């Protein structure tokens, strides 16, 4: 799989030549397709050939489209990702409920842990409160520690008047970052032969990416960290580039250093193994420096 993220903005024509993505603008740029992990189309003035799309899909390149407001509006999902996908889906359906609940508990605890570490990093005293919430997470999160932690966390980062429902550059940048994470996880899940629709916690019948939403939770603070220090006053190309730099981040799984894409692969494999064996301690979470 590739590792590069390519962002296309403005007027452009894209086509295929000798296994290269050819970008025709004022100048012509060629990028070797096997190097590409994600292609983001951030313009309604981009045209491309079906031969290119076919090749990108075959190489498992995630193609994401943005609307006029520069927010992501959709992506292309490959129908056929792994030769034994029917077997993997049967395994997915047979994951025991107890195993799913225990895995969800660990994911929720790790998400709150990462939120607490970010608050500690910026010197916010509410980091200790979030660590308390983490220790109180029960199976099924029946006391909604995740929700309580989120309220304290976002108010600590962006102010007491901040709400995730507001239409502002901060939320736009957060949403874009989360959508990139979602696409990374969707790419990994489908490449492993599983269905993104069948979540282990998220069960929204209208959400095509329930499982992706479940697994990405501990990495959301990576995006929050970028947005907090960027303090966006607008949401345009520069802000997107700042978010996309996470693709080049070096992170850790255990003591081994990985790029983010490879780390997501290791993390997802460990979650699937934990679900299959019913042993939540097998999960290998991603660690990263702030």
Predicted feature residues:
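N-terminal ordered "arm"
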Residues: 8-50, 54-55
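Active-site helix-to-loop segments that bind/position phosphate- or nucleotide-bearing substrates
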Residues: 2-12, 26, 58, 70-290
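Glycine/small-residue-rich interface belts in oligomeric ring/scaffold proteins
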Residues: 35-84
């Amino acid at each position: 799989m590739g590792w590069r993220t390519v962002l296309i903005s403005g007027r452009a024509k894209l086509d295929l030549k000798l296994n290269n993505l050819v970008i025709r603008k004022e100048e012509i740029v060629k990028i070797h397709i096997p190097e590409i992990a994600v292609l983001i189309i951030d313009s309604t003035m981009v045209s491309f050939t079906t031969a290119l799309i076919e090749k990108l899909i075959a190489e498992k390149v995630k193609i994401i489209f943005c609307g006029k407001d520069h927010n992501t509006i959709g992506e292309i999902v490959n129908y056929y990702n792994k030769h034994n996908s029917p077997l993997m889906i049967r395994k997915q359906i047979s994951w025991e409920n107890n195993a799913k609940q225990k895995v969800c508990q660990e994911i929720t605890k790790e998400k709150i842990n990462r939120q607490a570490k970010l608050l500690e990093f910026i010197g916010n005293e509410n980091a200790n409160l979030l660590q308390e919430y983490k220790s109180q997470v029960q199976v099924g999160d029946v006391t909604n520690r995740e929700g309580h932690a989120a309220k304290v966390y976002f108010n600590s980062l962006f102010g007491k008047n901040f709400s995730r429902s507001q239409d502002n550059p901060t939320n736009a940048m957060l949403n874009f970052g989360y959508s990139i994470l979602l696409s990374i996880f969707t790419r990994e899940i489908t490449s492993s032969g599983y269905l993104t629709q069948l979540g282990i916690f998220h069960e929204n019948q209208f959400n095509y990416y329930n499982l992706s939403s479940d697994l990405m939770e501990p990495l959301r603070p990576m995006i929050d960290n970028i947005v907090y220090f960027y303090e966006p006053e607008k949401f345009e190309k520069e802000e997107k580039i700042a978010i996309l730099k996470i693709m080049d981040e070096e992170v850790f799984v255990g003591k081994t250093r990985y790029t983010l894409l490879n780390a997501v692969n290791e993390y997802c494999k460990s979650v699937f193994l934990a679900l299959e064996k019913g042993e939540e301690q097998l999960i290998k979470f991603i660690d990263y420096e702030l």
